[in-house]
C-alpha cells in the first residue's frame, strides 16, 4: 500500500495540481514532444508522493488526454512529469478478427511502477506511433509475450501475461518511464508520416511490402 512509510511531497503535489489545471475544463493537457529533456529522464518510483485526491485527478486527466489525442497509452513523462506512472486502454474494433497484430481488449489501467520481461523469444515487427513523436510511425520489433507487473492506485501489485498488441502497448509505455522513445530501436528506414502510412502501407499490417520498398529488414 502506498503511504505506509512515506509522506506526501507537498511541493510536488502543488506542481502536479498546477499541471492538471493546464488541461482546463476539458481535462486535455498539452503533450510533450520529442526533444524535451523530460522524455529522456529516468522517472522516480511512485511511493505515495501525491495525495490520493491529486493522484486520482491526475490519472483521470491523463486518461482524458490520451483518449482525446487519440491514443492507447500515455506516460507521465509525456505530460512533463517524471513519475513512474502511465495509463493504457485499447478496445477491439469490429473487423479486427484475424489481424496479425493480434489486437485484444485492453481495459483501462493506471500502471504505476510498471516493469516487464519477455516470455519466450518470439518477436513481432509492426508499425507503431507515439503521441510525443506526433505525425509519424515506424516499424518496431517487440516481444510477442511478456510478463507485465505494475501497481494500481491503491498500491496493490499485479502480474499478468500479456500477448500481442496489449503487450506492445505495455512495453511502449513502460519504456517511456526509462527515458526511451520507440524510435530509438525502430527500423529508421521505415519512418513514415501518418498520411503516407495510410496511402501506401495500411493494407499490409505485416510490413513486408514496406520493407521491400523502403529498404529495411523484418
UniProtKB/Swiss-Prot annotation:
One of its GO terms (biological process) is translation. Its EC number is 3.5.1.88. Keywords: Hydrolase, Iron, Metal-binding, Protein biosynthesis. One of its GO terms (molecular function) is metal ion binding. The keyword Protein biosynthesis applies. Binds 1 Fe(2+) ion. Fe cation binds at residues 130, 172, 176. The keyword Iron applies. InterPro entries: Peptide_deformylase (IPR023635), Peptide_deformylase_sf (IPR036821). It comes from the Bacteria. Its cofactor is Fe(2+). It holds the Pfam family Pep_deformylase. It catalyses: N-terminal N-formyl-L-methionyl-[peptide] + H2O = N-terminal L-methionyl-[peptide] + formate. The active site is at 173. Removes the formyl group from the N-terminal Met of newly synthesized proteins. Requires at least a dipeptide for an efficient rate of reaction. N-terminal L-methionine is a prerequisite for activity but the enzyme has broad specificity at other positions. NCBIfam families: PRK00150.1-3. Belongs to the polypeptide deformylase family. This is Peptide deformylase. It comes from Bifidobacterium adolescentis (strain ATCC 15703 / DSM 20083 / NCTC 11814 / E194a). The gene is def.
Amino acid at each position: 500500500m502506498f503511504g505506509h512509510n512515506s509522506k506526501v511531497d507537498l511541493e510536488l503535489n502543488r506542481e502536479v495540481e498546477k499541471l492538471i489545471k493546464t488541461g482546463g475544463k476539458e481535462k486535455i493537457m498539452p503533450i510533450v514532444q520529442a526533444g524535451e529533456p523530460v522524455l529522456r529522464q529516468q522517472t522516480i518510483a511512485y511511493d505515495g508522493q501525491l495525495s490520493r485526491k491529486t493522484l486520482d485527478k491526475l490519472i483521470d486527466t491523463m486518461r482524458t488526454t490520451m483518449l482525446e489525442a487519440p491514443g492507447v497509452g500515455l506516460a507521465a513523462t509525456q505530460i512533463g512529469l517524471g513519475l513512474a506512472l502511465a495509463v493504457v486502454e485499447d478496445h477491439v474494433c469490429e473487423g479486427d478478427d484475424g489481424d496479425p497484430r493480434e489486437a485484444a481488449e485492453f481495459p483501462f489501467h493506471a500502471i504505476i511502477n510498471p516493469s516487464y520481461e519477455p516470455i519466450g523469444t518470439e518477436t513481432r515487427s509492426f508499425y507503431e506511433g507515439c503521441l510525443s513523436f506526433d505525425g509519424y510511425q515506424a516499424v518496431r520489433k517487440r516481444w510477442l509475450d511478456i510478463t507485465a507487473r505494475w501497481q494500481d492506485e491503491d498500491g496493490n501489485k499485479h502480474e499478468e501475461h500479456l500477448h500481442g498488441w496489449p503487450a506492445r502497448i505495455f512495453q511502449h509505455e513502460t519504456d517511456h518511464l526509462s527515458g526511451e522513445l520507440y524510435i530509438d530501436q525502430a527500423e529508421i528506414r521505415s519512418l513514415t508520416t501518418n498520411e503516407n502510412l495510410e496511402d501506401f502501407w495500411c493494407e499490409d499490417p505485416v510490413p513486408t511490402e514496406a520493407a521491400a520498398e523502403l529498404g529495411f529488414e523484418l
